[in-house]
């Protein structure tokens, strides 16, 4: 097994560990994730049909997406994260809400890919890659974990002045949607770069969607613009 510290930002782990008990507070630090989760879930289910599938959620945090995929009909959902405190929150919430066929493990995705290659119908890695030193390694591991006829989903944040204004200046400092320091603009990823990572990992990008926030209605919606938040739906190229 490789060095457990590789591709792990200890500062990011500590940051999310400090607020691990807030994951299921829909008006707290993770409100935005709760708000966009129905969009993410429908996008994934629309492309991959979760019913009866084995699913892996990489960087699952407190289990917001993982639990919703289990409720949508997945046969088995595994969530992995490097913040054990977040996983404890996820396990407790699933147990209290009688969500079956779901498990959580503190393990790097690269190590899981070595242990269980080509073992999941669906692999999701949402709002996670902008928090690690080497996102390309994450993409390669996800590609190794998915079955040849499966699908991999990524979501992250574009790197441009608009995303800086929306996600850092507005979301962190003006509107206070998320705590200050949640995002590091230097780690944002332009879609062309993520597409290159996917190709080099043996994945074809089948679809791309963006997400936009409507200020007046205070709701999120899918859109064709990838200027800020965006998602990829990918298939193995071989």
UniProtKB/Swiss-Prot annotation:
What EC number(s) does its UniProt record assign? 2.1.1.222, 2.1.1.64
Give the originating organism. Neisseria meningitidis serogroup A / serotype 4A (strain DSM 15465 / Z2491)
Matching entries from CDD domains are given as: AdoMet_MTases
Concerning PANTHER family, the annotation shows: METHYLTRANSFERASE, UBIQUINONE BIOSYNTHESIS O-METHYLTRANSFERASE, MITOCHONDRIAL
Question: What protein family does this chain belong to?
Answer: Belongs to the methyltransferase superfamily. UbiG/COQ3 family.
Pathway of action: Cofactor biosynthesis; ubiquinone biosynthesis
Catalytic activity, per the record?
Answer: a 3-demethylubiquinol + S-adenosyl-L-methionine = a ubiquinol + S-adenosyl-L-homocysteine + H(+); a 3-(all-trans-polyprenyl)benzene-1,2-diol + S-adenosyl-L-methionine = a 2-methoxy-6-(all-trans-polyprenyl)phenol + S-adenosyl-L-homocysteine + H(+)
> InterPro entries attached here?
SAM-dependent_MTases_sf, UbiG_MeTrfase
User: Can you tell which superkingdom this protein's organism belongs to?
Assistant: Bacteria
The record's function comment reads: O-methyltransferase that catalyzes the 2 O-methylation steps in the ubiquinone biosynthetic pathway.
Q: What is this protein called?
A: Ubiquinone biosynthesis O-methyltransferase
| Binding-site positions, S-adenosyl-L-methionine | 40, 59, 81, 126
Q: Which UniProt keywords apply?
A: Methyltransferase, S-adenosyl-L-methionine, Transferase, Ubiquinone biosynthesis
Q: Name one GO biological process term.
A: methylation
| GO MF, any single term | polyprenyldihydroxybenzoate methyltransferase activity
- Signal peptide positions on this chain: none
* Keyword Transferase carried by entry: yes
């Amino acid at each position: 097994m490789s060095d457990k510290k590789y591709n792990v930002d200890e500062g990011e782990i500590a940051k999310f560990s400090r607020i691990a008990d807030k994951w299921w507070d829909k008006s707290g630090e993770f409100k935005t994730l709760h708000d966009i989760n129905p969009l993410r879930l429908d996008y994934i289910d629309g492309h991959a049909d979760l019913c009866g599938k084995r699913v892996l959620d990489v960087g699952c945090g407190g289990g917001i997406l993982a639990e919703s995929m289990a409720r949508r009909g997945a046969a088995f959902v595994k969530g992995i994260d490097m913040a054990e405190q977040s996983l404890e929150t996820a396990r407790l919430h699933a147990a209290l809400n009688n969500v079956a066929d779901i498990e959580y493990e503190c393990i790097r995705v690269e190590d899981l890919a070595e242990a269980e290659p080509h073992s999941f119908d669906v692999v999701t890695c949402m709002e996670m890659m902008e928090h690690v030193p080497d996102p390309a390694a994450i993409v390669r591991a996800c590609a190794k974990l998915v079955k040849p006829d499966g699908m991999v989903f990524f979501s992250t944040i574009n790197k441009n002045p608009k995303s800086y204004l929306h996600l850092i200046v507005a979301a962190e400092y003006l509107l206070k949607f998320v705590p200050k320091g949640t995002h590091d603009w230097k780690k944002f990823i332009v879609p062309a770069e993520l597409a290159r990572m996917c190709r080099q990992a043996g994945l074809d990008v089948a679809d791309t969607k963006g997400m936009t926030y409507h200020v007046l209605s205070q709701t999120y919606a899918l859109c064709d613009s990838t200027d800020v938040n965006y998602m990829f739906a990918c298939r193995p190229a071989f």
